Amino acid sequence: MGTVTYRPRAGAVLFGAVSLDRYIDEGLVLPGGGALNMAWHWSRSGFPFRLLSRVGDDSPGLFAGFLERHHIDHSAASFFGSGASASIDIVTREDRQPAMDNYVEGVWAGFRLDSGGEAAIAGAGCLHVVLVDPVVREIHRIGEAGMLAGADVSADFLDFRHYDEDRFAATMRHVDTGFVGWPGEPGHPTVAGLRRVAFGLGRLVIVTLGPRGILVFDGKAGRELSVPVNAIPVLGTTVGCGDAFIAAYLSARWRGEGLETALERARLAGAEATAWRRPLPDEAY
């Protein structure tokens, strides 16, 4: 983690878990996970990157087909391992929003980047990570080893369910930009803690609040923004909004666009995703 580099030396690297999404009430299994969703968005927009992740040998064709169809750069030798893929059970509630439970780490239990993955990260100008526990451990390890020096690092803290202020600060020491999809009110003490970390460490923290807008704590520039959004009818679900938002924001920023322009692109991308019943449109699968 170091000074911001908006034009990657060798493209960006995307690092995070992918999983088997088991739609229980439909008897359907689809490739999923925040990193895979991000990869689809970046591939669609033409943003150059390499995906670092791992799946097991239980459903390799499901993932291989997705990667090939969408021309997602990856190392097959590192991506496809042995054992069970990570998985999660999804049930669609009456309000059409997904309820997720029974996450199984599979090949991510005890995960460690191989030498190729470490080299890819060490050589990249930009790195985005989707934080589940095994990824958090690796970011701390490689950050403390100096492998993030010179890279612009961003991280998706998801809905902050497994974090508190101290743990957030420990991870943000290795990160330049943090994203939090906060499900509560903007006045909650947790949000105040996000602000303290951003300004205490001189980091950028972007908090999405759904129809309540976006909070930006720019500890680097010593400013904060409250960005309103226009509430729109949700025709599908909101499950894919966060990935769409972050993908659009980062591709804009890392191509040299300003903060406000990137936020507007991200807002529009997040709104588009509310028309989908899954994290991605049906045709993506």
Regions found by a protein language model. Name each.
Residues 2-8, 191-285:
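Conserved phosphate-binding/catalytic region of the ribokinase-like
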Residues 8-11, 15, 20-88, 94-95, ...:
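Substrate-binding N-lobe of the ribokinase-like
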Residues 20, 44-47, 72, 180, ...:
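Generic secondary-structure signature for well-ordered alpha-helical cores
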Residues 29, 54-55, 133, 240, ...:
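Residue-level marker of alpha-helix boundaries and capping positions
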Residues 17, 21, 156, 237, ...:
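Acidic active-site catalytic centers that drive phospho-/nucleotidyl reactions
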Residues 19-23, 160, 232-234:
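A short, flexible beta-alpha/helix-coil linker loop
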